[in-house]
C-alpha cells in the first residue's frame, strides 16, 4: 500500500491506553490519568466492567506474554517497535544492564516522552531511550539498532502486524531478518500472531469498531495457523517457541522467532 497515513494507528494506541488503565500493567493507569484525566479513566473502568472475561484479560495477557518471552530469551538489549503508549521499557530499565530502545512514529512518541517525564517511577539502573522511528522506512530500523550496545538483541512488537498489509509485513520481516543476521543469537518476539475470528464480539465503543473496520484489522490477520507459520518460514524465520494464551477461543499466540 502506498501513501498510507500511518499516524492513524495512534488512534488505537490511545484507545488501548484507556483499556490498559483497567489492568495491572505497569504505569498504565497513571499514564492514562495524565493523558485523559481521572474522570475519563473512571468511565473506561465502568465500560470494561461490562466486557466478557476474555475481552478483559486479552490485552493484559498479550502484554505479559512479551514479558515472559523476554525472560525466556534473556537478552539485555531490547528494541520495541511501535510501542504506542506501553511503558514496558520504563519498567524494565529499572534493572541494571538493560538497554531498552522504545520506538514509534514521531507524533505519538512525543506524547509518550512527555508522559515518561511526568510519571512517578523508581530510579532507572538500566538505559531507556525513546526514538522516533518508522520501522517500514528502508534502513531505519537497522540504523537504530546499530546504536545499541554490542551483543544480541530482542526485537519486540505488540499490536502492530494486524495494521500492516501483506507487502508491509514482508518489508518489516525483511528488516528484522537483516538485524538477526548481523547480530548472532538475536530473536524476534511478536505477540501479533492473530488468526481471523468469525465470532469476534463487537466493541462497546462504535468509534473503535469503525476504526477497526477502516484499518481492515480482521482482514489483515492471518487466515489460520498454517498461514501464519508459512509466512514466517517464507521470510526466513523458524519458530523457536510458541506461547499460547489460556483462552478457549485461541485466536492469538506470541512467538519467539530465529532465522533459518
Region locations from a protein language model:
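A short SAM/SAH-binding and catalytic strip from SAM-dependent methyltransferases
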Residues: 152-168
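Core SAM-dependent methyltransferase catalytic element
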Residues: 244-260
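Rossmann-like AdoMet
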Residues: 1-79, 83-131, 139, 149
Amino acid at each position: 500500500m502506498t501513501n498510507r497515513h500511518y499516524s492513524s494507528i495512534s488512534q488505537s494506541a490511545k484507545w488501548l491506553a484507556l483499556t490498559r488503565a483497567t489492568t495491572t500493567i505497569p504505569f498504565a493507569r497513571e499514564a492514562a490519568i495524565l493523558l485523559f484525566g481521572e474522570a475519563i479513566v473512571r468511565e473506561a473502568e465502568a465500560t470494561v466492567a461490562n466486557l466478557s472475561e476474555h475481552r478483559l484479560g486479552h490485552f493484559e495477557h498479550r502484554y505479559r506474554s512479551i514479558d515472559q518471552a523476554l525472560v525466556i530469551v534473556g537478552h539485555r538489549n531490547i528494541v520495541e517497535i511501535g510501542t504506542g503508549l506501553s511503558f514496558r521499557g520504563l519498567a524494565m530499565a529499572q534493572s541494571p544492564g538493560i538497554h531498552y530502545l522504545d520506538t514509534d512514529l514521531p507524533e505519538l512518541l512525543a506524547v509518550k516522552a512527555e508522559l515518561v517525564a511526568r510519571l512517578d517511577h523508581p530510579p532507572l539502573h538500566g538505559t531507556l531511550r525513546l526514538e522516533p522511528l518508522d520501522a517500514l522506512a528502508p534502513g531505519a530500523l537497522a540504523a537504530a539498532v546499530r546504536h545499541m550496545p554490542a551483543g544480541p538483541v530482542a526485537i519486540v512488537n505488540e499490536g502492530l502486524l494486524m495494521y500492516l498489509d501483506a507487502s508491509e509485513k514482508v518489508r518489516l520481516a525483511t528488516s528484522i531478518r537483516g538485524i538477526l543476521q548481523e547480530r548472532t543469537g538475536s530473536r524476534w518476539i511478536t505477540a501479533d500472531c492473530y488468526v481471523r475470528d468469525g465470532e469476534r464480539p463487537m466493541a462497546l465503543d462504535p468509534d473503535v469498531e469503525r476504526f477497526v473496520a477502516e484499518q481492515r484489522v480482521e482482514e489483515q490477520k492471518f487466515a489460520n495457523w498454517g498461514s501464519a507459520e508459512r509466512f514466517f518460514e517464507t521470510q526466513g524465520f523458524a519458530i523457536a517457541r510458541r506461547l499460547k494464551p489460556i483462552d478457549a477461543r485461541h485466536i492469538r499466540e506470541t512467538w519467539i522467532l530465529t532465522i533459518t
